[in-house]
Amino acid sequence: MKSIKLISFLDIKNDSLVTNKLKKDNTVFLKQGSLDGACGPYCLFMTLIILGLIDYDHAINLWWTKRNSKFGKMVYKMQEHGTLFQKGTHLKQLKVLLEYSFQSKLELNVSKEKGKRLINFCIEQLKQNKPTIIGINGSDLSHWLLAVGFEKNEKGEVSKLFFLDPSGNDIPNYWNATIEVKKKHRGRYPYSWIDFAEDRFVNLEDGISLGLK
């Protein structure tokens, strides 16, 4: 029988995905703007909300955050890259943002692997209840997604990874993006992102998980 594993901090209430680590202002999903390249920071913010380190109001009003707070330090560091991260972010930059701000609160695990090895890293982190930010690359795509769970098939093998995609739709569900990881295709981009009318083929490259100390 198929089974699904999700990060235990997540719940659905009042038509929204929320975190049970906060009692109020606990909506998780953040919608990325169509003109910015800040998918990485959006994934960071959603992870911080899930872990109860910031709330939704902090995230949507980030430029008003007190500079001496942990989140304020992150926002200040972000300004070095321009307001909208138009050129996107790399794994090293995401790690620096976290180390500069929430290092005392978080246990970070970084993987520079790709493909199957990165998938295995992601699965192990999710088993430990750690949201995991994963890089996705395709022929015309470079993007960050936030992994929040996985599906096992009838043989007990992980067949799909479930993500929150900041560029996707805000729906009352635990995830809004799915990548098939058991069945591989030939070529540079062997995995199917199956949330489209026609599958998009991608590879998974680089990841960072966040857990509470």
State where each predicted segment sits.
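Short, well-structured alpha-helical interface segments that form or flank functional binding sites
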Residues: 34, 38, 89, 117, ...
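Noncatalytic regulatory segments and standalone regulatory/sensor domains
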Residues: 150-213
